[in-house]
Amino acid sequence: GEVRARVKIDVEACVREAVLSLGYNDEAVGLDGRTMRVINEIIPQSPDINQGTALELNKDKEIGAGDQGIMYGFACNETPELLPLPYVLSSRMMRTFETCGDPIFAPDGKGQVSVEYNTEVCGPRRLAKVLMSNAVDYRQINGLSREAIKARAKEIAFGCLADWVDKDTVFLFNPTGEWQAVNSCSAADSGVTGRKLVVQFYGGYPGAQLGGGAVVNKSPEKVDCSAAFGARYVAKNIVAAGIAEKCAVQLSYAIGIARPFSIYINTFSTCGSATDERLAQVVEELFDLRPQGLIERFDLLNGDIYRRIPKTLFMDDYPWEKTDMADKLM
């Protein structure tokens, strides 16, 4: 990666701290943050880019977008969080596994749910399937059979999803049969940062598109980061205002230029009070979607945010989850 800074950062220490905070403290669970090898290949940012995007070089709040690209935001009224139900349920399940404290389940895992929808009312009807893949620390199983481990995982998953589970909900756990913790994480899968954007961006919900770049490895002048939050903020406030039942917001930017290259809104024929084109005009008038405006509104120079967003971009008390613009949109 590239970065330009006036401070010296102990990159290796930061990396080790982050890895250990995720529970990777033993090679038996795939990785040990204390003994792993850290290779630092961060280099200075190109001066050609830096001259148009650096905060300290642009005091007039017109810093340009750190790159060109298209970012999307989405909201719908399926849940109190104004997010698609499958995204909310799968996120809830993953958080529960992370915090349950059961030593059998190692840090490496991923979940997926399938929700059946009622096409007549365009709303969720039932939770059809739940899939949980999680590395198992076989040092901790104390003779438990594979079926007993699955039963324990099912109890955790169905417990946190109880309001949607029914007698016909199917549960799958480690469908290949076995996933040993020693063969998890970087010991088995090199991967790259931001490899599975759909996990963070609305869970593949129809109509909720993905932008071209990851969020979690970007500084805020990179609109892959800040504008993704801005687009979600706009969409959520439109739905919170009761203007539409669901809303997708597309923002595009040109590198070095502060204001959006384009603004596009799609309310999927659920807005009866205005056209999508008129909504886009109102959004451009009411929302400051320049990188500096987004950085200030969302407090994106606060380093604590970047410790949290790798786990979830939405649902928490993030500034872009506020609906404080809903009244102004009405």
Question: What residue spans do the PLM features occupy?
Answer:
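Conserved phosphate/anionic-ligand binding catalytic regions in large, soluble enzymes, centered on
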Residues: 63-79, 180-213, 304-317
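Alpha-helical support elements that line or immediately flank enzyme active sites
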Residues: 75-95, 220-242
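Short, charge-patterned binding micro-sites
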Residues: 1-6, 255-259
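Glycine-rich, mobile lid/loop segments that gate access to catalytic sites or pores
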Residues: 13, 18-24, 28-182, 317-326
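Glycine-rich and small/hydrophobic secondary-structure elements
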Residues: 2-15, 19, 74, 78-81, ...
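Glycine-rich anion/phosphate-binding loop at the beta-strand->alpha-helix junction
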Residues: 139-239
